[in-house]
Amino acid sequence: MTEKKPMIQALQAVRGMNDILPDEAEAWEHFEDIVRDWLRSYGYRPIRMPIVEPTPLFKRAIGEVTDIVEKEMYSFEDALNGEQLTLRPEGTASCVRAAIQHKMLSAGAQRLYYHGPMFRHERPQKGRYRQFHQIGVEALGFDGPDIDAEHILMCARLWDDFGLEDVRLELNSLGSSDERARHRAELVAYLERHRERLDDDGRRRLHTNPLRILDTKNPELQDLVDNAPKLLDFLGEDSLKHFNGVQVLLKDAGVPYRINHRLVRGLDYYNRTVFEWVTTRLGAQGTVCAGGRYDGLVEQLGGRPAPAAGFAMGIERLLALWRESGGEAEPAQPDVYVVHLGEQAQRLAFRAAEALRSHGFAVLMHCGGGSFKSQMKKADASGAPVAVVIGDDEAATGEVGLKPLRGPGGQQRVALDGLANAVAECLFTENEEEDGSL
């Protein structure tokens, strides 16, 4: 009796890190194509950074006493040299590090963008993943309110391009480090007077990162933080002028916004303008896009002092919002499906397929054998409007059969050197019929 082999256990993806299967991946590519065109229309250029960075980069940039650094980073020791490494939790620090390392600012101010996976060790839930994807935009070397306004207007245009509704802009200014220090002292004194009302998280942050208490989601603390000292009241002349300059440009462009005194962002490197685009259409996790200025970060990471601003948006959330608003990507379909039967027919089929691809057609070549009937079923299912059919008779004469699959008309014989023109004519005729031109 043959001994039964034990079942090999199938492995699964890590929880919170999702496979993006072909139907979904096509929607992502359609979305990313639109985004790339949008970014280029504003003069932004692509940059690609490593997924793994030295851990001190994020500790220095994001801040030691932040949720990201304290709780959420995937960090490990390099077994070869003992270096502490981290899967990037965000892109700004990496982009600034690259700009410093390669002396990019010596050539002048830079408008840059990137997109790709980021990693945070969070509890997976709707709209939150351990591996998620971001589009990041960074403008290095620009110090005026105009670049802040440009970033916000860029987002407004993208929402319009995608037909997104119910996305609202919230705005605040964090001022300079000196202004934040004065506000911090008043804020800590205020919170100390109400220490008994703070939750465990608030008491922990009281003397390490009190600004983050203003961003609490605890409903029992809402009236406490609503009455806390407002950073806007501590801004000096320069910070107020900068913030007013942003608002003037937004009003000129007709972009509505709400000043949110509790908007502080979760990363330590921000100063002056900060903003978020939020929606109620994605449940509790309603931030679609966020950004602001980080004028001290270049120097903080070892570069010469340089102003900077940027923003990032989550691709998963944007796609969900786009679909919620009725957005849909058309599935990719070939122009031509090639059917063949017999060895000589197969050889001619490969030549025909490559000839069509040389003329820019998308061609799906049947592989795996089967009868003409079964192959034609697959041709119909592929969505291709035209089939190239090759059997022994066609192979013997060096010709191919051309059969419309969607419109009227029967199969015709075409010489190989005239195939591209014949396919183009078939596709043109079909498009005219779909448009109602005939």
UniProtKB/Swiss-Prot annotation:
Catalysis performed (reactions): tRNA(His) + L-histidine + ATP = L-histidyl-tRNA(His) + AMP + diphosphate + H(+)
A GO cellular component annotation here is: cytoplasm
At the top level, the lineage of the source is Bacteria
**What molecular function does GO assign, one term?**
histidine-tRNA ligase activity
Listed InterPro entries = aa-tRNA-synth_II (IPR006195), aa-tRNA-synth_II/BPL/LPL (IPR045864), Anticodon-bd (IPR004154), Anticodon-bd_dom_sf (IPR036621), His-tRNA-ligase (IPR015807), HisRS-like_core (IPR041715), HisRS/HisZ (IPR004516), HisRS_anticodon (IPR033656)
Tell whether Cytoplasm is among the UniProt keywords: yes
PROSITE patterns for the chain: AA_TRNA_LIGASE_II
Annotated keywords: Aminoacyl-tRNA synthetase, ATP-binding, Cytoplasm, Ligase, Nucleotide-binding, Protein biosynthesis
Gene Ontology terms: biological process: histidyl-tRNA aminoacylation
User: Where does this one sit in the cell?
Assistant: Cytoplasm
Supply the EC number(s).
6.1.1.21
- Ligase recorded as keyword: yes
The main place the protein resides is: cytoplasm
Among CDD domains, the record links this protein to: HisRS-like_core, HisRS_anticodon
A Pfam family found in this protein is: tRNA-synt_His
**Do you know which HAMAP family this protein is assigned to?**
His_tRNA_synth (MF_00127)
| Subunit-structure text | Homodimer.
Family to which this protein belongs:
Belongs to the class-II aminoacyl-tRNA synthetase family.
Its recorded name reads: Histidine--tRNA ligase
Give the source lineage, highest ranks first: Bacteria, Pseudomonadati, Pseudomonadota, Betaproteobacteria, Rhodocyclales
